């Protein structure tokens, strides 16, 4: 009798978990926008308690609606949130997902700049990975307007703030001549 009850319980538990996953609500753009409204507090400061949840909502929307024209935008915004959360691995994952699924989106090259500068260079202080991100932008998007920025960022890798400032001043003086 106990064995039958245990078996029945396990079967019901399994059926319940399947039913829950099948009835998972499909997110709409309105759901995403509602989540977005919770991201900033009244002082326009990121609500760090809600940030991870909002980023997950963005990612879930993209997963459920991969052909929606706004999908690349939400992936990029999820990446931005994860930059603020200092979640480097998730940023890299989202950047790669964005480039792989939406290579023609203008958000793809932007994600490489974000990944290279804020994640690899600033947070991880890994100039080799930053260089790879910038070079990937140059190689995969040679006609994009951010290529010149990527080239400058490569030249600035490893420089101190003072050296970067001197480099900018020197280039401005050369332009004036």
Predicted feature residues:
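Bacterial signal peptide processing site
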Residues: 21-23
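Alpha-helical segment of the N-proximal tetratricopeptide repeat
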Residues: 30-60, 64-65, 84-85
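Short solvent-exposed coil/turn linkers within tandem alpha-helical repeat scaffolds
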Residues: 61-71, 85, 100-108, 124, ...
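Residue at a conserved register position within TPR or TPR-like alpha-solenoid repeats
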Residues: 82, 119-120, 158
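Structural register within alpha-helical repeat arrays
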Residues: 78, 115-116, 154
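TPR repeat positional signature
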Residues: 31, 35, 75, 112-113, ...
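C-terminal motif of bacterial Sec signal peptides marking the signal peptidase cleavage site
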Residues: 16-19
């Amino acid at each position: 009798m106990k064995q039958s009850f245990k078996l029945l319980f396990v079967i019901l538990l399994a059926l319940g978990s399947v039913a829950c996953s099948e009835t998972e609500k499909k997110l709409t753009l309105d759901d995403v926008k509602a989540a977005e409204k919770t991201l900033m507090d009244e002082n326009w400061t990121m609500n760090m308690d809600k940030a991870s949840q909002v980023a997950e909502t963005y990612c879930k929307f993209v997963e459920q609606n991969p052909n929606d024209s706004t999908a690349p935008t939400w992936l990029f915004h999820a990446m931005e949130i994860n930059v603020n959360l200092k979640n480097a691995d998730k940023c890299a994952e989202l950047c790669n997902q964005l480039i792989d699924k939406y290579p023609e989106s203008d958000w793809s090259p932007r994600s490489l700049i974000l990944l290279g500068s804020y994640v690899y260079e600033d947070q991880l202080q890994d100039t080799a990975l930053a260089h790879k991100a910038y070079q990937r932008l140059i190689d995969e998007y040679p006609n994009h307007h951010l290529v010149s920025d990527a080239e400058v960022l490569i030249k600035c890798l490893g420089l101190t703030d003072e050296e970067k400032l001197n480099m900018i001043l020197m280039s401005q003086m050369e332009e004036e001549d």
